[in-house]
Amino acid sequence: MAVQQNKKSPSKRGMHRAHDFLTAPATAVEATTGEAHLRHHISPNGYYRGRKVVKTKND
């Protein structure tokens, strides 16, 4: 089992963890319906880039 040679200081520990945070997913707003959706995904109404691409129950 690996054991550290020297104790890591709080500063170095913080520097090591500096990039461990989560980023919020990028969302886009559909031009026709105004709904927010993940980029490069269709909106809940079945629209992608202003065009209807999937049939939904309401159609």
UniProtKB/Swiss-Prot annotation:
Highest taxon listed in the record's lineage: Bacteria
GO cellular component labels: large ribosomal subunit
GO biological process, one term: translation
Keywords: Ribonucleoprotein, Ribosomal protein
Region span, Disordered: 35-59
GO molecular function annotations of the record: structural constituent of ribosome
InterPro entries (UniProt xref): Ribosomal_bL32 (IPR002677), Ribosomal_bL32_bact (IPR044957), Ribosomal_zn-bd (IPR011332)
Ranges of compositional bias, category Basic residues: 49-59
Pfam families referenced in this protein's UniProt entry, alphabetically: Ribosomal_L32p
NCBIfam families referenced in this protein's UniProt entry, alphabetically: rpmF_bact
Database matches in PANTHER family: 50S RIBOSOMAL PROTEIN L32, LARGE RIBOSOMAL SUBUNIT PROTEIN BL32
Similarity field: Belongs to the bacterial ribosomal protein bL32 family.
Protein name: Large ribosomal subunit protein bL32
Organism whose genome encodes this protein: Polynucleobacter asymbioticus (strain DSM 18221 / CIP 109841 / QLW-P1DMWA-1)
